Amino acid sequence: AAEAYMIVSHPQWQRARQMVADGAIGRVLHITGGFSYDNSDDPQNIRNQAAMGGGGLRDIGVYVLGSARYVMGADLENISAKIRLESGFDTFASMQGNMGDATYSAYVSTRMHPHQEMVFHGSAGLLRLTAPFNANIFGEARIELHQPNLGLRVERFPAANHYVNQVEAFGHSIRTGAAYPWTLEQARGTQEAIDTILAIGTDLA
């Protein structure tokens, strides 16, 4: 079983994972992420309906959490969180913890100006994805590799479509039995982290 989790079918994420595994930024020490948009003017939206499983964490928390888990190959542990609720659903959540040896800090919001970014900060460099989740819609998909002595290498992915790639990967898996890039077990791990954040998060005024 698998989940239709499109970002892992995008070459920018496949490349980011490979670069981290190859030691391009040294030892990963800290991960930061953010994903926000504002749908406050649409009260009937399912994301604004507590009874229908609304809230930012269930909608976009899967991306700031799942993407980091994909790159690091580790689960979020030692979790702490702060949550702002509105009519029973979260409109802002900040979360902290550890993924392997790295610390982790991220936020999601459905009441803030649109923004998305993921950063992997290592002992020998920094990897930044500028449009990590809505590639070529929010902005051009690209990876910035910041290196010593103000070195900067940028890899661009202007033509990639992760939805097309996802369908092709699914078809390839069906035809050949090849592993699908995001299993049900991986999806469950992200959902367990979200459930923990919702359960232990401290309410913000």
Model-found features: residue ranges?
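A short glycine-threonine-serine/GTX helix/turn-capping micro-motif
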Residues: 52-58, 153-161
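Predominantly a Rossmann-like dinucleotide-binding segment in NAD(P)-dependent oxidoreductases
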Residues: 7-79
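Contiguous beta-strand/loop segments that form the cofactor/metal-binding neighborhood of enzyme cores
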Residues: 65-136, 157, 167-178
